[in-house]
A protein has these predicted regions:
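Short, basic-rich loop-to-helix N-cap that marks the start of a DNA-contacting helix
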Residues: 52-64
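The alpha-helix within a helix-turn-helix
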Residues: 18, 35, 66
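Residues that mark the N-terminal boundary/hinge immediately upstream of a DNA-recognition element
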Residues: 30, 58-61, 72
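DNA-binding alpha-helical recognition surfaces that contact promoter or target DNA
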Residues: 12, 47, 67
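DNA major-groove recognition helix of helix-turn-helix
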Residues: 49, 61, 77
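Short C-terminal boundary/hinge segments that cap the last helix of small helical domains
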Residues: 70-77
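Short alpha-helical DNA-recognition segment
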Residues: 24-48
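A short, Lys/Arg-rich alpha-helix, primarily the initiator
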Residues: 1-27
Length: 77
């Protein structure tokens, strides 16, 4: 697996679990909301969820995303 493939997998899974979170919770999380909750800027989440993701994400930010979405971090891989 290449680095680019891994970035796409992680990004797609962040989007999938954010949308699942929205399906099961009254509080809906936009990309902006998620970014705010992890202390990042909105473009990070947008780029991460994009199939043209060339930014990647730090382990710390992925950990924070996993906590906000209540998803074990390994589910993103």
């Amino acid at each position: 697996m290449t680095n680019e493939e891994l970035k796409k997998i992680v990004g797609r899974n962040v989007r999938k679990y954010r949308l699942l979170y929205n399906a099961y919770n009254k509080e809906k999380l936009t990309q902006k909301d998620l970014a705010s909750k992890i202390g990042a800027k909105t473009p990070l989440i947008g780029a991460l969820e994009s199939d043209n993701n060339n930014m990647g994400v730090s382990i710390y930010n992925l950990y924070m995303i996993s906590k906000v979405l209540n998803v074990p971090i390994e589910k993103f891989f």
